[in-house]
Regions:
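Contiguous, non-catalytic segments that form substrate-binding/exosite surfaces or channel walls
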Residues: 2-127, 346-354
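Short, solvent-exposed segments of well-ordered alpha helices
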Residues: 133, 137, 159-162, 199, ...
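Inter-helical turn/loop segments and adjacent helix faces that build the functional surface
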Residues: 83, 153-159, 178-188, 218-226, ...
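Post-HExxH zinc-binding segment in Zn-dependent metallohydrolases
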Residues: 155-202, 287
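Short pre-active-site segment immediately N-terminal to the catalytic Zn-binding motif
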Residues: 124-142
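Active-site-proximal binding-pocket segments
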Residues: 195-216
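C-terminal, non-catalytic "cap/extension" segments appended to globular domains
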Residues: 9-30, 35-50, 229-364
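Catalytic glutamate of the conserved HExxH
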Residues: 141, 145, 149, 153, ...
Length: 364
């Protein structure tokens, strides 16, 4: 059976990905990461449904502070001067030479199809699109995408792919802390917390079928209508979903991949953040958890290490990069002990906001 007989887009992507990741420590330990994902899913779905998070996001959007383009640029420049001074010249250059493309008010189909993203175009030129919302999310997004222009270099397999999100999300979170010090209230900044939490939940949900799919593809070949039954027969993974749910997600992936291909053709993107990479969402999951850990342990040492990750992201393995910030990805118990408390703190903060409790810091 060829790659294009059933679910053609998905099978081509799985094939390319397995070739790219051949013999890697990560690909050979899919089961470990799958079980970590299951535990995260149970933790995340305990308090909020997707619909509830959407409602909270809409509320937080209304309560966020309006920011003009000028205000966003001034705030972001001030943040970089204070927290990332070595990158100020580069930031200003990216703004002046168009590397950072700020879409203030999308007007045509070309602009309306743009997302907040960074990558390289067909000529291999760096770019970062930042679509303004004219609220307190804008400086956070601008910092996030700017960091991607710094670490968007030729791949070192998994190292850069899945660590760069940790770097960008850490500094977007650090920007939120900076905004608090500048007088922004917790309520005005909740839009960022809720967006990131909803994104984390969605990414974890997306990952659930991906790990079994990759194992199935490696061992059984292209995904088809028999894959689920064969996976169960061979006990490839203890599938945490019904057959109907499994194939529903596969169909959604196939449709999404087709849309992404069309969109990338429209925008002439060849090296952007490709959702067709099966585990692209893993970068957002591990990145968010590392960022929360870094902010919660907000010492200057951690901050400097996160900055230095940009310099070594193409020179070390995935596990070595995490070890640099005192995270052992191979020790499940130790890993959960470090990443779960900061995540729980975020969950409690959103729960307090949801119930109407005041989120302002209390006097000690």
């Amino acid at each position: 059976m060829g790659l294009t007989s059933e679910y053609p887009n998905l099978n081509i992507v799985l094939n390319d990905y397995c070739l790219w990741m051949e013999d890697s420590q990560f690909l050979n330990n899919l089961s470990y990461f799958y079980h970590l994902t299951i535990k995260l899913k149970k933790l995340l779905e305990k308090d909020f449904t997707c619909q509830k998070l959407e409602e909270l996001y809409a509320k937080a959007k209304e309560e966020s502070r309006y920011l003009s383009l000028t205000e966003t640029l001034l705030i972001t420049t001030e943040y970089i001067e204070e927290r990332l001074p070595q990158y100020k010249t580069r930031f200003l250059k990216c703004l002046s030479d168009g590397t950072i493309n700020i879409v203030a008010d999308p007007e045509d189909i070309y602009e309306k199809n743009k997302n907040n993203e960074a990558g390289r175009d067909r000529k291999k030129h760096l770019y970062a699109n930042v679509v303004l919302r004219h609220n307190t999310k804008d400086p956070v997004t601008l910092v996030h995408e700017f960091l991607h222009t710094i670490n968007n270099e030729p791949d070192n397999r998994i190292s850069r792919k899945y660590i760069t999100e940790a770097i960008s999300i850490y500094f977007e979170s650090d920007m939120c802390e900076f905004l608090k010090r500048k007088g922004f209230t917790e309520k005005e900044l909740m839009i960022n917390d809720i967006f990131r939490h909803a994104d984390l939940s969605g990414c974890v949900d997306d990952l659930m079928p991906i790990f079994p799919l990759l194992d199935s593809f490696r061992l059984l070949g292209p995904i088809n209508s028999d894959s689920y039954d064969r996976m169960q027969q061979l006990s490839i993974e203890p599938l945490a979903m019904s057959k109907e749910e499994f194939y529903s997600k596969i169909s959604n992936f196939e449709e999404r991949l087709a849309r992404v291909r069309k969109r990338n053709e429209l925008l002439h993107i060849t090296d952007g953040p490709k959702p067709q990479e099966p585990l692209v969402t893993f970068g957002y999951v591990i990145g968010t958890l590392i960022a929360y850990y870094g902010i919660e342990n907000g010492t200057d040492d951690i901050h400097q290490r996160m900055i230095h990750l940009n310099n070594i992201v193409n020179k070390a393995t995935f596990s070595d990069l995490l070890s640099y910030i005192d995270i052992d990805i191979t020790n499940e118990k130790g890993l959960l002990k470090k990443i779960v408390p900061p995540l729980n703190k975020k969950i409690q903060k959103i729960k307090a906001y949801s119930s109407g409790e005041k989120n302002e810091p209390k006097e000690k």
